[in-house]
Amino acid sequence: MTASAMRGAALAVVLVVGACGGPSPSTSHTPSPTSSAGTSPLSSPTSGPASLVHCTTAVPAGDSLVIGTVAGDATIVVRDIQDPAHARNLCTFDSSVLAPQFVSGTAVAYETAENQIIKANLSGGPTTILATYSSGFDSGQYAFSPDGQSLTYLDSNAWHLVSSAGNRVLTTLPAAPGRGVSPDEDDSFLSFSPDGQYIAYFQTFHTGGTGATAPDQVRRASDGALVYSTSGMTMAVWASLPSRLYFRAATGPVLRWDPSAGVTPMDSIHWIRPHQSPDGRWITYSLRTSTGVHGVGFYGVQADSQIASTAAGRSGARFLSNDLVWYIGERACSTCFGGQPTPTGVTYIYSIAGASEITSRLSAVHDVWPRVTAPAV
């Protein structure tokens, strides 16, 4: 994924553990670069195995694309949604592929059972191994810079940045203790900012550190230097250009960090799993309702308020474009783990401009392209 790129996959691994609360907030602003030289620069990756993505037709330049599945078929595909009424599959992934996402409009990345992060061109040809990681909690969560030239990933407790300067460890965080998980509060967000200048890692599992080992950090993408750290935060998302990071604590308003103004309190929204629109004007997210199931909300970045929300029984929202938002239907389930809602099997697409909802043929969405478009605020 993106954005958050891999936040859902990382959290799904630990949801089998249980449920519990989170830490109280504390903050540090002291830059503390901790990177060290590595061995696998993105500029000279290792030749990889045969590609696990296969395209039956050329991918049109500039079209809107999605990696996901279509109702009735578990095969993960690259689907052209430039014309939503006439969407079509362009490529398929082998069933062994894990965590696929776009590197660009012409290349994808995925993980293998051998713990490799692979880059493959949609036009065919050889693949490249960008990084390998060990087995363990949080290992393999990864994200690309907007230009596809840098990669950040987690290898157990170590946070890596791979660029033309090499593969460096930005920091090593405290080990994640065995504990329960709160699905609506715990999160792991790893993502480059829309302008590519910063990388954020905000999570609720590797706790107990401060400064360079704090659980919530923003680092400069050019050199890995720490520019902001805090703790006790969750559910982060980048939005707008110049890039600003939004996040929240267990209580209180959403907070916004930017390089110039620091941290500013915003509207009070207890959002869950937020995602930004490509143009940075909107953030969509799940909200817990009084019925026990979720609804989907839409936050206007310029207005600093929730502009609209759906009926209850919707969650897992992702932007397909600057206007269209995809999400799943859900219903209450008293026998499910932790009393969590369960999917209905129906998915939807919502138009913000039209304030309207239709059913969708997409049964899952892993990533979309483009991730960043103009204009942005």
Which residues are covered by each model-predicted region?
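Bacterial lipoprotein signal-peptidase II cleavage site
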Residues: 21-29
